[in-house]
Regions:
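Segments of small-molecule ligand-sensing domains
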Residues: 152-221
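N-terminal post-signal-peptidase region of extra-cytosolic proteins
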Residues: 69, 94-97
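Surface-exposed patches in mature extracellular/periplasmic domains of secreted proteins
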Residues: 2-7, 31-33, 107-109, 161-163, ...
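Active-site proximal loops enriched in glycine and acidic residues that flank catalytic Cys/His/Asp
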Residues: 6, 87, 111-114, 135, ...
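Extracellular/periplasmic Venus flytrap/periplasmic-binding protein
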Residues: 1-90
Length: 223
């Protein structure tokens, strides 16, 4: 069972819908779909969707019935196995630390690639430790000479880096399309990820890599 937490925007809605469709198709259960905005109290949103407010309400009702104060530690809902987060780096840096405040630091968080700026920033991203996200190998390869040269020349953002990767792989793929379509099992390992042809639709499919924030740095996950 999962909670989806997405921004209150057109992109956030699309990301949330895509996750919901996939999750349910895979047999998952979505227990909450929450949308946050710039004016939304993130604390209130998390407290409500994690049912911490309900725990506090039960305590208050019990105190009222007994007529005395009780020692009490609020509890979050126990039917959540994962949290899907669609967020920018700035949004995620606000939201992720609050999970611990609401007793949910043990819930695995899986995010969209938008959570990572594309450039190492351990002091800013330390609050994201533990979050896993999928991305293209190009974004994680800080030692790639071509990537660094393009980045330095264009002062590239993460979005620009992704567009550059698309252009580079498109060029090389144009020379390998016949091979991809004639040999169904062919896999092209590009900087976008593993590219192959779907046997039914003939569309090109891309398999990205997984990364996790460890010590404020985005590091590849082996499996």
């Amino acid at each position: 069972s999962a909670i989806a937490l997405v921004p209150d925007s057109e992109w956030g809605y699309r990301a949330g819908e895509a996750f919901t469709d996939f999750w349910i198709a895979e047999g998952g259960n979505l227990v909450s779909f929450a949308r946050y905005g710039d004016s939304t109290s993130h604390a209130d949103l998390l407290e409500s969707n994690l049912h911490v407010d309900a725990s506090i309400a039960r305590k208050n009702a019990l105190q009222g019935n007994l007529g005395r104060a009780l020692e009490f530690t609020p509890r979050r809902r126990q039917d959540v196995d994962a949290l899907f987060l669609a967020a920018s780096p700035q949004q995620a840096r606000q939201l992720k630390p609050m999970l611990a405040f609401f007793f949910a630091e043990d819930i695995p968080v899986y995010a969209t690639s938008s959570i990572y700026s594309g450039f190492p920033d351990p002091s800013a991203d330390r609050d994201l430790d533990g979050v896993k996200f999928s991305t293209m190998p190009w974004i994680l390869n800080n030692d790639n000479e071509l990537r660094n040269n393009l980045s330095n020349q264009t002062n590239a953002s993460a979005t620009a880096l992704r567009m550059q990767a698309l252009g580079i792989d498109s060029f090389y793929l144009s020379q390998r399309l016949i091979q991809l379509y004639e040999a169904p099992d062919t896999i092209y390992r590009g900087i976008l990820g593993k590219l192959s042809k779907d046997s039914q639709s003939n569309d090109l499919e891309r398999e990205q890599v997984w990364a996790q924030f460890i010590g404020g740095l985005a590091r590849p996950v082996n499996n």
